[in-house]
């Protein structure tokens, strides 16, 4: 196993962890209002009213966000399989070829999720329009983690494909 394979494996693992964390954290969209802060996630929606304890419930997701969640979960599975194949490439060199294609599939799935997610900004909890959030609403830390997972997947693919050779 060469250094570039190890680097790409670490990048894919980081992307995998960031994607899992982005789903687990209910901060994809944050209203940040002082009276009642609302954070909307893909698996939980939390609200804090006037400094009381935070209350979290499962959200009713629009079809666009269900599709986004599906694509992210499939991307996570792809990256997990990729990491396994890169470990297996220590013994069977041809596993690297399959790992690259599966990682590429994961990148496509993540990019599709990133394109579809903003279509769901129209829901009542957010109050925006497709691809346009209201002025008082921002994307949260979970969305940033998800974008980082896309970035690490792309850079990992560059190293796995030996496109980004050092020196």
From Swiss-Prot:
Any one GO BP annotation for this protein: negative regulation of smoothened signaling pathway
Any Gene Ontology CC annotation: ciliary membrane
Name this protein carries in UniProt: Uncharacterized protein C16orf52 homolog A
Source organism phylogeny: Eukaryota, Metazoa, Chordata, Craniata, Vertebrata
């Amino acid at each position: 196993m060469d250094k570039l394979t190890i680097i790409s494996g670490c990048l894919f693992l980081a992307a995998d962890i960031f994607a899992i964390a982005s789903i687990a954290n209910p901060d994809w969209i944050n209203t940040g209002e002082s009276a009642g802060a609302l954070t909307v996630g893909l698996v939980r929606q939390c609200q804090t009213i006037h400094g009381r304890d935070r209350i979290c419930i499962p959200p009713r997701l629009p079809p666009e966000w269900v599709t986004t969640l599906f694509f992210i979960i499939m991307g996570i599975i792809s990256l997990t399989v990729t990491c396994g194949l890169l470990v297996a490439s220590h013994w069977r060199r041809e596993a690297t070829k399959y790992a690259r294609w599966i990682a590429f599939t994961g990148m496509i799935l993540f990019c599709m999720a990133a394109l579809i997610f903003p279509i769901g900004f129209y829901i009542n909890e957010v109050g925006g329009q497709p691809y346009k959030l209201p002025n008082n609403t921002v994307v949260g830390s979970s969305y940033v983690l998800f974008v980082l997972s896309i970035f690490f997947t792309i850079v990992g693919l560059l190293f796995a494909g030996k496109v980004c050779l050092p020196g």
